[in-house]
UniProtKB/Swiss-Prot annotation:
It comes from the Viruses. Residues 84-95 have a biased composition (Low complexity). May participate in the formation of a layer of cross-linked glycosylated fibrils at the viral surface thus giving it a hairy-like appearance. This is Collagen-like protein 3.
Length: 939
């Protein structure tokens, strides 16, 4: 019934939102009962308070920024109420998506041909060392293969070099549960090394002078996390060979591909030990590979290996962080802002910060407990070292100031445990290794545990008596150290096999601090080969140069795509190379994924406009009791008939309706007294109305929870709300009484104002209170107003006003309707002398002003009460002194003149006005108010 919005209804000047609309805002259609006559109205939905320059009287406007509802009356938009409430429940789960087809399996690269295994030869002399092969040329880049099926989880990547310190990231979501750690193997027997020679006794040092008091040290930098040690391979039994000649320094070769796993070689004669090779040249920095073509988006697979670091992207949008709502002066359009207090993400649009979503995620699952390692093998206790010479006692230094506590360094990863070596002959003693580079200064360590008591040293020679020193000053009491964090519990290793105790080696000289070299890139982890044949221990090779550090890539912006359906498990693909460690991305947490197997949860739809509640549908199957039919109109008066001839005396007929006073007839003959007529037949029952159409079967997932009906006048306090959802409130004020008097005809009472299925969002943590109004009581020489009916939920107060009592000449005014003290509509006026009351006033189908009572007699007749929809006002009593009828309410016809509600209401006449007094009869009572609240879990 609503036409399209015309352009002339749009504003010709800027409204409070700063935008002049040339098209109509979204509209919502509301169905109005067919028996209600009203002008075509429109409902506007927009942001901000409406401007009076658009819209017509009777239109509605919803401000989506505040959920305030406005009604236009007399050219002005009036605030009706606020439709805000608690958030609705989650929507139903969307259907499970179709299963994606398996992707094509990528072609596996060919494995190089394995050399034939040689037969065990007879003892032969060791041949000369072959020349180093030329460096192969770089192969051309292969085309992108088809998308392969998901491969098995790759081996743990080697730790990359420490990246530059990034800016503090946002708190990320808890990661996926890690896989259990690999269980280490047990160590095997090792040969006992030769006992080192006893070092000569050092000369007695001179007495040092007292040092100056040192300045307070600056806080040390946090140490880098240690790399994971490579896993050593096991050696096999072999005879010890002679030491070979020292080879010339070879060029540094390119990094070779990982070869296939070779078979175990047969035992062979021991070769001579080669000389220590010279230090290789530093290799050139490898060229950066080309980017692959972008493939089509496939089904989402399981979590893959860490990808290669991408090229540097262009500068993106700024992401700001703070506590609380961002200031309008902060940032530029397009920037994002994260409120650290609430987890809300804001975007700046048109110079305003608009909340977008919350990035706070759910807590992840607890990871599985790692496997317990096997026990380590027992090792023999080393021999006791020779006691050292007793040094001179130094002077007591000044107490240094307490340094700041350094940051606790990251715990290094546990190195892989090497496999056990098979029994082998003891190798020659290795030469003294070069001194390693000094590591960066670590943070101050926590106080170590008390060591075990050492063995008693041999008694030294008696020293000369020293001079008596001066008594030192008492030192200040040191500050209590902060309690250190509890360290992680290490994995228990297996017990090692018994091994011979090694001799104590000589103490090497202290080397000169070398310059710290650049950290080299970490190579791929090679495939573990089988145990080789026994070989002599070679000399320790020189340390290679440290590779250049790769350039740091830009931080990528995380744009989360839609979650794909879980694909079938693909066949096992080839193991990929370990990717370069990427920089830390900004932590913008996505939505928590659904449990596997279950379909994705549908996106939460944007909040729709709150529609006005339509008419209540018929109950499924069993039909609701139909509304009471309208009272038929009084038939029109017929013309006066001609005087008929005297007929035969008939049986006494039914009493006819009172006719008009006829002309005086001629006196007839006196007739015989007639027999008493038989009782007339009972009138036929009215025809049954047409059967209503069968309603649709009610849903088994009904949102309806229950209803509360308050049909007795009085107070109802702190009543329980059974659900968090929406409540539809129907309420009516009490009716006013008719004016009482016996000397003339007086006005009828007005009906109460009403709410019909008015929607209010509620929470089960709330309660509601209500007052159901008492009907206006008759009183001689006057009338009484019906009481108001009120409902209070939180800070919302709905008031359905009681109807006014009639006066000596006019009918009572109907009850008004207000929300939080603001009048939404007034009641309809009562009729003046001899005139009917005005029918109910509609603001919309949810709010109704009460109908007015009929006016008192004007010397000829009184007026009827005003109507409401299907209910009619009370009929005025006849005669020059007849009383006016009462106004009709939401639930009942008005009471006729000179009648009213009984002292104990029958429960069906809620809110109706009492009839006016007349013809010697007092005026009638008004009927009491009523409240009904229907609770639903969702609109």
């Amino acid at each position: 019934m609503f036409g399209n919005c015309q352009k002339q209804n749009c504003c010709t000047q800027r409204n409070n939102t700063g935008i002049c609309y040339s098209v109509c805002p979204p509209q919502t259609v509301i169905t109005v009962p067919g028996n209600v006559t009203c002008n075509a109205s429109r409902i506007y939905v927009n942001i901000g308070r409406p401007n009076n320059c658009f819209g017509n009287d009777g239109d509605l406007y919803l401000d989506t920024n505040t959920n305030n509802l406005y009604y236009k009356r007399d050219g002005v938009w009036l605030l009706v109420g606020n439709l805000s409430g608690s958030s609705g429940p989650s929507g139903p789960q969307g259907p499970k998506g179709e299963k994606g087809s398996n992707g094509d399996k990528g072609d596996k690269g060919e494995i190089g041909i394995q050399g034939l295994k040689g037969e065990s030869g007879a003892d032969a002399d060791k041949g000369d060392k072959g020349d180093k092969g030329d460096k192969g040329s770089k192969g051309t880049k292969g085309e992108n293969g088809d998308k392969g099926n998901k491969g098995d989880k790759g081996d743990p990547g080697i730790k990359g070099s420490k990246g530059e310190k990034g800016s503090k990231g946002d708190k990320g979501s808890k990661g996926d549960k890690g896989d259990p750690g690999i269980k280490g193997e047990s160590g095997a027997d090792a040969d006992k090394g030769d006992k080192g020679d006893k070092g000569s006794k050092g000369d007695k040092g001179d007495k040092g002078i007292d040092g100056n008091k040192g300045e307070k040290g600056s806080k040390g930098d946090k140490g880098d996390k240690g790399d994971i040690g490579l896993k050593g391979e096991s050696g096999a039994d072999a005879d010890k060979g002679d030491k070979g000649d020292k080879g010339s320094k070879g060029d540094k070769g390119d990094k070779g591909d990982i070869g296939p796993k070779g078979e175990s070689g047969a035992d062979a004669d021991k070769g001579d030990k080669g000389d220590k090779g010279s230090k290789g040249d530093k290799g050139d920095k490898g060229t950066k590979g080309e980017s692959g073509l972008i493939g089509t988006k496939g089904d989402k697979g399981d979590k893959g290996d860490k990808g290669i670091k991408g090229d540097k992207g262009e500068a993106g949008t700024s992401i700001l962080e703070g506590s609380g709502v961002p200031s309008p002066d902060l940032g530029n359009n397009g920037d994002l802002y994260i409120d650290g207090m609430t987890g809300l993400l804001y975007a700046k649009i048109n110079d305003e910060w608009v909340p977008v979503t919350s990035i706070k995620g759910d807590k992840g699952d607890k990871g599985d407990t790692g496997l317990k390692g096997e026990s380590g093998a027992d090792a023999d206790k080393g021999e006791k070292g020779d006691p050292g010479n007793k040094g001179d006692k130094g002077n007591k230094g000044d107490k240094g100031s307490k340094g700041d506590k350094g940051d606790k360094g990251d715990k290094g990863d546990t190195g892989l445990k090497g496999e056990s070596g098979a029994d082998a002959d003891k190798g020659d003693k290795g030469g003294k290794g070069e001194k390693g580079d000094n590591g960066e200064k670590g943070s101050k360590g926590e106080k170590g545990e008390k060591g075990e008591k050492g063995d008693n040293g041999e008694k030294g020679d008696k020293g000369d008596n020293g001079e008596k020193g001066e008594k030192g000053e008492k030192g200040e009491k040191g500050d209590n150290g902060e309690k250190g964090e509890k360290g992680d519990v290490g994995i228990k290793g297996e017990s090692g096999a018994d091994a011979d105790k090694g001799d104590k080696g000589e103490k090497g000289d202290k080397g000169v601090n070398g310059d710290k070299g650049d950290k080299g890139s970490k190579g791929d982890t090679g495939i573990k080969g089988e145990a080789g044949t026994a070989a002599n221990k070679g000399d320790k090779g020189s340390k290679g140069d440290k590779g250049d550090k790769g350039s740091k890539g830009d931080i990528g912006i995380s744009i989360k795509g839609d979650k794909g359906d879980k694909g079938d498990k693909g066949s096992k693909g080839d193991k990929g190379d370990i990717g370069i460690k990427g920089e830390s991305g900004l932590s913008i947490k996505g939505d928590k994924g659904d449990k596997g197997g279950k379909g994705d949860k549908g996106d939460l739809g944007s909040k729709g406009d709150i529609g006005l509640k339509g008419d209540k549908g018929d109950k499924g199957d069993v039909g609701l009791k139909g509304d009471k039919g309208d009272k038929g109109d009084v038939g029109s008066k017929g013309d006066k008939g001609d005087k008929g001839s005297k007929g035969d005396k008939g049986s006494k007929g039914d009493t006819g309706s009172k006719g008009d006073k006829g002309d005086k007839g001629s006196k007839g003959d006196k007739g015989d007294k007639g027999d008493k007529g038989s009782k007339g037949d009972k009138g036929d029952i009215g025809s049954i109305g047409p059967k209503g159409e069968k309603g649709e079967a009610g849903s088994t997932n009904s949102l309806y929870i229950g209803s509360a009906q308050l049909g007795n006048a009085g107070d109802f306090n702190n009543e329980i709300i059974p659900v968090t959802g929406i409540a539809y409130i129907t309420a009516v004020g009490a009716g006013g009484s008719g004016y009482s008097g016996t000397t003339g005809g007086y006005g009828g009472g007005g009906a109460g104002g009403a709410f019909i299925n008015y929607p209010v969002y509620v929470s089960s943590s709330q309660t509601y209170s209500a007052h159901v109004g008492f009907g206006g009581a008759q009183v001689a020489g006057n009338s009484n107003k019906g009481e108001n009916t009120t409902i209070t939920i939180g800070n919302l107060v709905l008031l359905a006003g009681g109807g006014e009592g009639g006066t000596a000449t006019t009918g009572g005014t109907g009850g008004l309707v207000s929300i939080n003290g603001t009048q939404i509509t007034a009641g309809a006026p009562g009729g003046t002398s001899g005139n009917s009351g005005v029918s109910s006033i509609y603001i919309n189908p949810l709010v109704i002003g009460g109908a007015g009572g009929g006016g008192g007699s004007n010397g000829t007749n009184a007026g009827n009460g005003g109507n409401y929809a299907g209910f009619t006002g009370g009929i005025a009593s006849p005669g020059v002194n007849g009383g006016g009828g009462g106004g009709a309410s939401l639930f009942s016809n008005g009471f006729n003149g000179e009648t009213g509600a009984p002292t104990t209401d029958s429960g069906t006449n809620y809110g109706a006005g009492g009839g006016g007094g007349g013809n010697g009869t007092q005026g009638g009572n008004g009927s009491l108010g009523y409240v009904r609240i229907d609770f639903y879990s969702a609109p």
